[in-house]
Amino acid sequence: MVENVRELLKAHEGITHEVYLDNENSTIVPQEVVDAMLPYYNKKAYGNPTLTHKPGWEAFEVIMGSFQKISKFMGAKILEEITFTPSETEANNLALMGAAFANKAKGRKIVISEIEPINVLHVAEMLQKYNFSTTKVPVNTEGTIDLEKLKETVDKETVLVSVQIVNNELGTIQPIKEAVAIVKDKNPEAIFHTDASDAYGRIPVNVQDLKVDMATVSSFKILGPRGIGALYVREGVNVEKILEGQIGTQKLWPGIENTPLIVGFTKASELAFENFEANTNRMRSLRDNLVDGVFKELTDVKLNGAKGDKRSPDNANISFLRAEGEALTIELSLSGIYVSSGSACSRRLLQPSHVLVAIGRKFSEAHGSILMKTTRYMTEEDITYVLGVLPKAVNRIRGIVGSTGVD
């Protein structure tokens, strides 16, 4: 396996232009964020924030400042409503398991949309082992949740509802305020969680305005370091911690806080929000140029997800008929263009994305999908380069498929 990877890397030698569009699965951390983090490894605030000495007090001060800033960016009422976790995945695990276990006397029914991310979907299914039931609410062909079905599904036994603000694969923006209102009208005791990771830094997110009880955000989704995320839990909502260990500054997540990563997450948030409108307009313009160019140059392509204002400004998920997605990612990589297959969450099992299946895509359409996400650091030249390579790569793969009779 390692030798195969080395051969693939050798094949990339000589690439002169690189465009990183796989911002769903990881991101390039800007130098400003790296520079903000580095001193906290060995220059200052490197202590345990719970200990009574200078490095500990420095760390405590920095972490409290980050709590305050992230709570402000999310629209939380008080900083104690924020818990830092090692990632979006851990935050979603804490939200679903912690809320379900803490409130099981009120009901054992969990409701999610059928296109929730794997780290929500699998946790909801796992909770069935503990005598909880899971009901999935369908979406339409754009990936928008069926609010009437949601209304029919929620009842007095519903303890928890989880619906993303923005779907990570499709970019479709859900009507969260309306969904929360429906849930609370049917059952005021039900807890509403949203994974806001793909909304945070891209569209306005204010947890008080949305009236959600819990919300997850992720650092790397906004060009911060991997290994850090956060969970908002509204004051008064009962959530149990799901791990045991040394208690630091947080009651819901044990262990010593990772000061450098928290600082990096905070800096990335500051950069995302300081010129928010300009940043999102830039992402949208680049994305639109990319999508328009693809549809101009190629036939037999489909845009997956919603359009216009109902879509996140960075997301482009396109199905290329008669061109297998994994083959296309490799072909593009050899030209310095890095994207992901739309079936990335389950590609090791060679299964199509559950999200694309849910919106009605055929097997061949789902396996021919490519997910690309723009950032504020990309340029028009990057998009021009992609549009000069992508159509040729698609046609080359289609030619191979056609010559072998494979469909």
What are these regions (language model features)?
Residues 1-407:
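Pyridoxal 5′-phosphate
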